[in-house]
Amino acid sequence: DDLGDAQRRAADWLLDVTRTGAGTHLLVYPAAGMQPAMRATKRRATVDVLTSDVDQISHMREALVLEGADDSIHVERIPGVVPNPKQWRGHYDAIVTVEKVEQLSPQERKEYIRAVDRFLTPNGRAGIQSLVATEAMTDAGKASIQALRAYVWPALDYPLTAELHQLVDKNSNLRIVSETHVGTHYLESLRQQRSFFDGHLREAAAAGFDPVFRRLWTFQFALREALMTLGMIDAVQFGLAHRNRGGRR
């Protein structure tokens, strides 16, 4: 289907950014879905997926069994959004994050990028997909996000691209080595997601999602679609590498 194809393409682009291939040890963190992990197994990579969401873990593991990928992908629970060095010690050739940075508080963003720095091997690559604010963002646009912050993502804040560069430069030994704007692709994906959800409202109701939740989910798709159509937000894939071959400072 069109939506599935779009999601697979976006995942493949991030895997290309991180040079994921046969033998790569990939970390998907924090988990936002299984598409990057599933696509990585097609390249014969070994994948760890980290999440702090207990409910998400059971759904992910069920999906892995259905796909026959439970031998190549390992889903692990971490105590919080960002694990400290004692809670997770792994080192990885590649790290992928999809649309999580914008949902973190300012302090969590700093801790997150330090964790990526810590987890990434000296010659590894990280790929981060994030929604960002553009110079076209207005006060009205910012105000509209308050609803998403109140009911969906409490810490939601779309950073400027320059702010993400500053985050990386000031809090890690990493640097952004590539930046690809994929807003046009993302906008079409949003439209497809909204259409798919609207076409399956009965199934959502049967699964236990009440009318308020269903309307809220349709609203968040429509709002993000509107902000992107107006050019107030963009979708960007960043490629990161260590500044020197020595890796972590």
Regions found by a protein language model. Give the residues of each.
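Conserved SAM-binding loop of SAM-dependent methyltransferases across substrates and taxa
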Residues: 33-44
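A short acidic, Gly/Pro-enriched loop at the edge of an enzyme's catalytic core
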Residues: 83-96
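A short glycine-rich, Lys/Arg-flanked "PGG" loop and its adjoining helix->strand segment in the class I
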Residues: 110-125
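Conserved SAM-binding loop
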Residues: 60-61
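Conserved SAM-binding strand-loop segment of SAM-dependent methyltransferases
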Residues: 67-84
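Helix-to-beta-strand junctions that scaffold the AdoMet/dcAdoMet cofactor pocket
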Residues: 69, 104-105, 120-121
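Conserved alpha-helix/loop element of class I SAM-dependent methyltransferases that forms part
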Residues: 1-25
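Substrate-binding/catalytic lobe of Class I Rossmann-like enzymes that use SAM or dcSAM, i.e.
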Residues: 132-237, 241-248
